[in-house]
Amino acid sequence: MLKLLIPTIMLFPMIWTLNPKWLWSATTTHSLIIASLSLTLFKCYSTTQWSNLNYMLATDMISTPLIILTCWLLPLMIIASQNHMSTEPINRQRSYITLLVSLQALLIMAFSATEIILFYIMFESTLIPTLIIITRWGNQTERLNAGIYFLFYTLAGSLPLLVALLYLYNTAGSLSFISMNLISIPPNTWTNTFLWVACVTAFLVKMPLYGVHLWLPKAHVEAPVAGSMILAAILLKLGGYGMIRMTIMLEPATKSLAYPFIILALWGIIMTGSICMRQSDMKSLIAYSSVSHMGLVASGILIQTTWGFTGAIILMIAHGLTSSALFCLANTAYERTHSRTLLLARGMQIILPLMATWWFIMSLANMALPPLPNLMGELMILVSMFNWSNWTILLTGTGTLITASYSLYLYMSSQRGPTPNNLTFMELSHTREHLLLTLHIIPIILLMIKPELIWGWCW
């Protein structure tokens, strides 16, 4: 893992010593090299055991795709932020890139930690750079309110997890992911019920599950483009990754305690999808769409089947790339219209036809059109849900229909219709923006051609 961590850490002195003229191009190039280097983790991919194992860090079939996604996203965030950060003083630009790089370093350590307490520390540490990015570089004064929601929801969910980890250490004598899988917890005792809820709550808030999701739309709407990208693509998946790890460890208790959470997750798919149909704010619609998709991921994980886990991992990776691209597209519209309102951005297809093509492709990816990896993930979760209970097809089927509806609503509202007069003298699209979206779709195409890279246990 040091082959990724050391180059990432070496970015810090580079950022603060570079000539301002080369700041953005050099950091983008360096981060792209790290992203290319991360692809070598697939070579160490082992279907039966941990790879790159040392005392503190290791990778396996769950963490490898998420680490690579984290490394791939840093250059994309830097490219996306160039335009709106160019007017800032040079030291603020350096601070901004430093926060993005520190997030990557923390996330790599979180995804590759073998000790649960190290994972917990890194899980909480990602909160600090994200909070600074939202509250310092957000667009409006509501960013402070969004930051408070983000901070207190996450902290309130994480405190019970810390208590549960201390209890686990006292009873089991170890907090290693590798050894904890061998220790079974006896079911049907009040202590273990509270232990299971405490361990899972932090990750359900982070995903987020419907009911504890109110921080996410606020944080997404107020964050700058890089904040929205990292939040949608990686930080929500940190909750899913933690759930996969913890529910396997708490296995006997999961089967009996997961039922209400599965039903809440499925109900949340329909509710948040319905909320999307009523949104007038572009970023808010994409944010609620993320809550809907994460509800499907949560239900797939809580089912505790091989297909459920694999579908959840595939959907997390595919959704990370798709939602990040949608936030980039929303940012391109915002930079030209200075508004996130869908009605003020309509008719842009006539002025920016290539950008409208990107909107169309990403809207189709969001609604899980074949043969995209989004469909693979959703199908595997739907099949495992149907095998668990035939009645779930009513909720998941309705949720899929609503997802298709709001994805098309997003495209039609933002691209079709008469062009408002204020958009007549709009700035044309840049090569930088098309490069950014191309770098989003290349991994999606790769996963269409070779899906076994992220199929985990099912391959």
Swiss-Prot record:
Coiled coil stretches, renumbered: none
Signal sequence bounds: none
Membrane topology listed for this record: Multi-pass membrane protein
Primary localization class, coarse: mitochondrion
Enzyme class: translocase
InterPro entries given in the database record: NADH4_N, NADH_Q_OxRdtase_chainM/4, NADH_UbQ_OxRdtase, ND/Mrp_TM
EC number in record: 7.1.1.2
Transmembrane spans: 20-42, 61-81, 103-123, 148-168, 194-214, 224-244, 257-277, 284-303, 307-329, 350-370, 392-414, 435-455
Record keywords: Electron transport, Membrane, Mitochondrion, NAD, Respiratory chain, Translocase, Transmembrane, Transmembrane helix, Transport, Ubiquinone
Superkingdom as given in the UniProt entry: Eukaryota
Annotated GO biological process: ATP synthesis coupled electron transport; electron transport coupled proton transport
Subcellular localization(s) per the UniProt record: Mitochondrion membrane
Cellular component GO terms held in the UniProt record: mitochondrial membrane
Pfam families, A to Z: Oxidored_q5_N, Proton_antipo_M
Catalytic activity: a ubiquinone + NADH + 5 H(+)(in) = a ubiquinol + NAD(+) + 4 H(+)(out)
MF-aspect GO terms: NADH dehydrogenase (ubiquinone) activity; ubiquinone binding
Role of this protein: Core subunit of the mitochondrial membrane respiratory chain NADH dehydrogenase (Complex I) that is believed to belong to the minimal assembly required for catalysis. Complex I functions in the transfer of electrons from NADH to the respiratory chain. The immediate electron acceptor for the enzyme is believed to be ubiquinone.
NCBIfam families the record matches: NDH_I_M
Family designation: Belongs to the complex I subunit 4 family.
The protein's name: NADH-ubiquinone oxidoreductase chain 4
Organism expressing this protein natively: Polypterus ornatipinnis
